């Protein structure tokens, strides 16, 4: 099958566009809410604090109870998870 140069260029551009939608935006790159101008970075927790990490669960819900020391409350799941940072916060 013989494609013209223009068809090849269009096909390459479409592939780059399709791959760009999946690869181009990483989870930590979106930092500002376009509608409200809120800095979303301050609302996000690092991806390394995943509940899939062994031992990350602190063992309690945090909807009405404060999390234990070195744990944080996940805002959507309402569960306490262990801090995974190497440096402690003040």
Curated annotation (Swiss-Prot):
Per the similarity annotation, which family is this? Belongs to the conotoxin P superfamily.
The organism's place on the tree of life at top rank:
Eukaryota
Provide the alphabetized UniProt keywords. Disulfide bond, Ion channel impairing toxin, Neurotoxin, Secreted, Signal, Toxin
**Pfam families according to UniProt:** Toxin_11 (PF07473)
Family matches, as InterPro entries: Toxin_11
Location of the protein in the cell = Secreted
Propeptide stretch(es), residue numbers: 21-60
The record's GO CC annotations read:
extracellular region
Q: What does this protein do?
A: Probable neurotoxin that inhibits ion channels.
Q: What is this protein called?
A: Conotoxin Rg9.1
Tissue spec = Expressed by the venom duct.
Q: What is its main location?
A: secreted
Domain comment from the record reads as follows: The cysteine framework is IX (C-C-C-C-C-C).
Specify the signal sequence span. Answer: 1-20
Annotated disulfide bonds: 58-71, 62-73, 67-80
Q: Which organism is it from?
A: Conus regius (Crown cone)
Tell me one GO molecular function of this protein: toxin activity
């Amino acid at each position: 099958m013989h494609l013209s140069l223009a068809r090849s260029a269009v096909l390459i551009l479409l592939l780059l566009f399709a791959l760009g939608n999946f690869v181009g935006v990483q989870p930590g790159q979106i930092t500002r809410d376009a509608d409200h101008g809120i800095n979303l970075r301050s609302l996000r927790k690092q991806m390394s604090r995943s509940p899939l990490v062994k031992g990350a669960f602190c063992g309690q819900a945090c909807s009405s109870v404060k999390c234990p020391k070195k744990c944080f409350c996940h805002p959507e799941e309402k569960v306490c998870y262990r801090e995974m940072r190497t440096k402690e916060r003040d």
